[in-house]
């Protein structure tokens, strides 16, 4: 199968979904932490003939299940009519696929009318994954996210209204060493205002060539320590409060030092115990290193 992207980026909950790349890059491409921020990968579609060849290849395989995740940057940025055409094109090869999921930005939702979203849902749009990154307005501004917490919440309420499911993600350490507490509390507050199917957290990584890497190198951004990252994750998890709405919390990204996941209704305390043990272990290790230096 031919792809433009050599690595597969998909949410954990899509592990059993069929995968089809339809685009590469991001329509926004300005977030300081993002690999697309260098402007070298503009949003582009996979050529139609390649899409058809890949689908024909998939049709010859034993594709089970009814879900497909459309690989690419913010796929939801494309016009509703184009996305519906893609859904129908997929189903002409794989009629068993009835649910589609993809990544999108909050402003991709806001730029579509209720009628367009309803048409997408009826055509098979089931799940949209959105990176909220932080619930703190200042942190989002510093990261050049191009969206505010209120705009993100408005977009998610719009998806609720249209009965389209969504999964969210945020970045541990995005507030740096100085704003970790505010970052955790405000992000938890944002999560408490909406009803996601899943929440995924990953740890900030200053990837080569990004504005974030330059900010770290010139001292404008002080990364949070591993100990602080664990404290931040625990504070975030502690303050996400869903009384009846179940949500899957996934902290299994390769960037995280402590992998954990579970239901926020039934497994939250277990996950907090794991984090608190890790925080204590990190503190003990720091103390030992300090003692060695003094000795």
Predicted regions located by residue number:
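Conserved, mostly hydrophobic/aromatic
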Residues: 26, 34, 51, 70, ...
């Amino acid at each position: 199968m031919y792809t433009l992207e050599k690595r597969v980026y998909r949410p954990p909950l899509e592990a059993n979904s069929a995968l089809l790349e339809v685009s590469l890059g991001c329509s926004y491409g300005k977030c300081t932490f993002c690999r697309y921020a260098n402007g070298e990968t503009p949003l582009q579609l996979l050529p139609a003939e390649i899409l058809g060849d890949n689908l024909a290849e998939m049709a010859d395989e034993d594709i089970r299940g009814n879900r497909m995740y459309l690989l690419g940057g913010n796929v939801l940025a494309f016009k509703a009519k184009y996305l519906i055409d893609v859904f129908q094109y997929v189903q002409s090869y794989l009629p068993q696929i009835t649910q589609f999921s993809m990544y999108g930005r909050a402003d991709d939702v806001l730029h579509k009318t209720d009628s367009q979203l309803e048409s997408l849902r009826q055509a098979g749009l089931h799940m949209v994954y959105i990176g909220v990154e932080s619930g703190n307005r200042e942190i989002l501004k510093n990261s050049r996210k191009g969206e505010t917490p209120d705009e993100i919440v408005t977009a998610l309420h719009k998806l609720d209204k249209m009965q389209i499911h969504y999964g969210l993600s945020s970045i541990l350490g995005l507030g740096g060493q100085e704003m970790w507490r505010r970052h955790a509390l405000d992000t938890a507050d944002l999560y408490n205002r909406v009803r996601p199917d899943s929440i995924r957290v990953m740890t900030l990584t200053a990837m080569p060539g990004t504005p974030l890497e330059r900010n770290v190198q010139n001292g404008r951004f002080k990364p949070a320590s591993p100990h602080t990252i664990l404290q931040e994750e625990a504070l975030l998890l502690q303050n996400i409060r869903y009384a009846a709405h179940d949500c899957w919390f996934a902290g299994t990204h390769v960037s995280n030092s402590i992998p954990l996941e579970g239901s926020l209704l039934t497994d939250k305390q277990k996950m907090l115990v794991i984090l608190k043990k890790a925080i204590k272990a990190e503190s003990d290790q720091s103390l030992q290193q300090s003692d060695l230096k003094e000795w």
